[in-house]
Amino acid sequence: MAYRKRGARREANINNNDRMQEKDDEKQDQNNRMQLSDKVLSKKEEVVTDNQEEIKIADEVKKSTKEESKQLLEVLKTKEEHQKEIQYEILQKTIPTFEPKESILKKLEDIKPEQAKKQTKLFRIFEPRQLPIYRANGEKELRNRWYWKLKKDTLPDGDYDVREYFLNLYDQVLTEMPDYLLLKDMAVENKNSRDAGKVVDSETASICDAIFQDEETEGAVRRFIAEMRQRVQADRNVVNYPSILHPIDYAFNEYFLQHQLVEPLNNDIIFNYIPERIRNDVNYILNMDRNLPSTARYIRPNLLQDRLNLHDNFESLWDTITTSNYILARSVVPDLKELVSTEAQIQKMSQDLQLEALTIQSETQFLTGINSQAANDCFKTLIAAMLSQRTMSLDFVTTNYMSLISGMWLLTVVPNDMFIRESLVACQLAIVNTIIYPAFGMQRMHYRNGDPQTPFQIAEQQIQNFQVANWLHFVNNNQFRQVVIDGVLNQVLNDNIRDGHVINQLMEALMQLSRQQFPTMPVDYKRSIQRGILLLSNRLGQLVDLTRLLAYNYETLMACVTMNMQHVQTLTTEKLQLTSVTSLCMLIGNATVIPSPQTLFHYYNVNVNFHSNYNERINDAVAIITAANRLNLYQKKMKAIVEDFLKRLHIFDVARVPDDQMYRLRDRLRLLPVEVRRLDIFNLILMNMDQIERASDKIAQGVIIAYRDMQLERDEMYGYVNIARNLDGFQQINLEELMRTGDYAQITNMLLNNQPVALVGALPFVTDSSVISLIAKLDATVFAQIVKLRKVDTLKPILYKINSDSNDFYLVANYDWVPTSTTKVYKQVPQQFDFRNSMHMLTSNLTFTVYSDLLAFVSADTVEPINAVAFDNMRIMNEL
């Protein structure tokens, strides 16, 4: 168009050659302009040669041909994909989809036994600290003194009870409590040692350093530090290390050393650790590495059963656990191999059905959704649902007779309990009213909702034909057998299913049905049912093999389940489409698939780790509930304790667990006994609460309240301070008693009579450097609110110090100001650090190696799958 417009403006006598020449010139000019601008703007350096243009033209020609061929390929690809999509839509209308929740699988697989954590330091609550000494006038001396202080001296802000501090401390001890201690791993060099000796850990070494460098340290102590070293008794595999510990810390660490969970490891233990049924399974060849050192150790997993019975009345918790188990089980069920070609099978089925133009719609429906993906999906769903005891629901179209006939196989091999009742009733009713009753000319069954009997149970009483009634009887009584193996409750399939004999029973019933006259139905209807039965009966051998394969894979993987398989219907269900069951029945080949040994070991390890962690977390929660009860914090902390317990199991979304289940869980946890180690640790804390309170800079042992002013007293540790070191001469009231009774009259009367009163009991106090700012608000903050609100747990007395380190010291020195306060903090002196009393020798094994993965010593292989045999010593797959 542009060319014509330009030509219209020119003279009429311009010939065609000129026009063509002009057009080429214009194109070249434009190209040159573009190239020039590109060259100016580009940062590349370009070497100009004479024949550059010719080379570029040749390159452009090559590029254009390449682009054309690419476009052609893309067109062909999209055409192929489009055809595939159309085929997919035609053949695969109803395929179940499973989206694995990878996050849950990762959480489960990431649960590792906590024994793996290596201790690098001893457990300590206290540390020695160097504090200055103040003279009587508040000036700092050059000397200092050592006291034991708390390492983590943290009290949260807000209304806080010191008893909560002890509960948190106990929780911290439980978290850090080691399963084993190997002192050799944490020992460090003593820098001040004469002969390169070692002390037990880095904190002991740093304390020794600080004491050695302190000018006031006695020569005898320095000489002792220089002599500090380990003492090895090689013949007994024992080593003693010197340590510097507070007596309470020593009691903790000595207890940990005496109650280690490690046990000697030998080949028998590893052999017995492998599930018995896998050891005895002839399809698996297990070999063990026999070179275990004598110092090998392991920690026995804690596999106690059903202490909380989560299947009983914990619907949402049980649903989460079964979902996690289902996702894990699906990841280990083997994929089917060498399935029959979908196209070939559909062609064969079409021939068997003699599909032609006159064929009724119902028979073309038989082929809907048959594909290998659906077959594999169905196989994995059935086994994983049984392993995790997840309830299934069935999706089907009543007019697809092939689906219903496949459903008859499904109901034969999978126990009724595995299906949600509504779905089971709907499927059975469809089979009865579509196939069984019409065959015998019986009227449709009108099923009343809520009937305790299922349609098959009603039909069993009404059907006269022996074979059909016999099959119905089997289905109605098809339940899991509960068998305890190695202390674990297993849900075992019926022997007739395991060996595949039940399929003969099913086929007899189907043959009887196909021979019936269907007197009340048209001929086409009868023919459709007969052809559907024919399709399934043609694959009798493959169905027997499929049933044996399903049972074998289920029972082999079940050997790796460590928690009791409790059967309770789940809140949510796993959907199973009957078209996928048809796919499985029609496409199963003769290739045997069994789980690989590596898969079995992985599945077993994940189950053991989760189960062991579950029991340890129960022990922690039970211990903390007991501690909260004994510290009178029962009401306050209970829901938080249960929430923490669920969080530490990793798989629960705690925010979505209903409150009623939380409190039910608390009630179950309360009934359990406390594990001995955890109880002993709590008793250690309880016996030494006074020492721990003394060592804190934020916990007081009481508060003295008066209306008249009380002068600050001089203290070696702080200077001038409103601290009372004893309560002589004061009327005392116990804080616990006050909180329990809520009777404040006694205190009010004393204060009105100008008598100071001492409230005794552990409580937090506030420290602040500015005395003046505190004195102004002292009465209101410390006690007025308490009397008004009748809440002792908001009581926070204020401590302040005036010494040469504080800004207020000069006010006192210059103006002879005598600071006073209407409250005093009652605080006992912390324990003084004495080197001789703090020196302890700790004893442990010189060396041992802890193995967490016992199955790493086992090398395993399988026989050729084609030779794999089931429990009856016959090949799993017999049909060739």
UniProtKB/Swiss-Prot annotation:
Positions of region (5-fold hub): 1-80
Gene Ontology molecular functions: RNA binding
Example of a GO cellular component annotation carried by this entry: T=2 icosahedral viral capsid
UniProt PTM: Sumoylated with SUMO1 and SUMO2. Sumoylation of viral proteins seems to have a positive role on viral replication.
Site feature: Interaction with the intermediate capsid protein VP6: A220, F224, M228, M839, M841
Alphabetical list of HAMAP family matching this protein: Rota_VP2, Rota_VP2_A
Subunit structure as annotated in this protein's UniProt entry: Homodecamer; each decamer is made up of two conformers of VP2, called VP2A and VP2B. Interacts with a VP1-VP3 complex. Interacts with the intermediate capsid protein VP6. Interacts with NSP5. Interacts (via N-terminus) with NSP2.
Function: Inner capsid protein that self-assembles to form an icosahedral capsid with a T=2 symmetry, which consists of 120 copies of VP2, with channels at each of its five-fold vertices. This capsid constitutes the innermost concentric layer of the viral mature particle. It encapsidates the polymerase VP1, the capping enzyme VP3 and the genomic dsRNA, thereby defining the core.
Family named by the database record: Belongs to the rotavirus VP2 family.
Domain-level remarks: The N-terminus binds RNA. It is necessary for encapsidation of VP1 and VP3. The N-termini of 10 VP2 molecules form a cylindrical hub underneath each 5-fold axis of the inner capsid.
Protein name: Inner capsid protein VP2
